[in-house]
Amino acid sequence: MRHIFASFSNWLTDLTGCWSPSFFFIWFLAETLYHWLAISALSVSPLPLFPRYAINTSGEEWPVQPRLLKVREWLRAQGLRQVQALKAEVGGGLYLRVSIYQDAASTLRVQVTFLPQNNGAIGLCYTLTSITGAGERYITDNLTVPFAGFYPENWLVERRPWSRSLARLLERHRARLLAAKATAVSFSTEPLNDLNFAQNELDRLNTELGFLHPHPEREDFGKITHEGRYRVWKEIWMLNYLGRAQRYE
């Protein structure tokens, strides 16, 4: 292993024309500065961290791109049906679009989030949720956006940002429930109310625990506290280079 690292170090030195530890140090500082400035800009921007959702009545419930239509057909083939199409404004007339699918027993919800990309493409992220008889909320997702905040104690969240396969994500979600010997029960509220309640709960909890500033102070100090910004910065590194988020269980 040592000789492999030495060979890589020599190759990197030849490529950059500098001593590799110095290169890595400068690169680390540049990456840190970039991410820290981006986090600070998000903190003081008008973009909501926990946007409120509304029913999507625009008719644009699912993008008509072949690769995205295949996902919809796969969901239907698994016995999942769409129960609601939602949207949330994140600023400047830009909307997050969400389509919620549910199984016949109403014990599993699959939230498909459409993320607009800078190049005009549309990214997909999935959030799978089940509620147990003990009141626990099992969440398995592949969101690539850092959260780094706090979840309620009865939320058991596993993030797998490098898993782009919905089939494998669903398999993992079911395996988690099976391993915990947890029995999923039917949802008692419709997706819109459940999602907005969850957003409000996350805002409240993260304000209480010091991840976010209290609402009256956000105009002067931004939304995210210094401790919160550090947590976000750390999670960005973990997502980008380790493919995993902080442990939330």
Where do the model's predicted regions map?
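Structured extramembrane domains adjacent to transmembrane segments
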Residues: 72-216
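Intrinsic structural disorder
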Residues: 1-3, 13, 17, 51-63, ...
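Intrinsically disordered, low-complexity regions enriched in serine/threonine
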Residues: 203-249
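Histidine (H) residue identity feature
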Residues: 3, 35, 173, 213-215, ...
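N-terminal topogenic membrane-targeting module
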Residues: 33-98
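Alpha-helical transmembrane spans
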Residues: 1-46, 235-238, 247-249
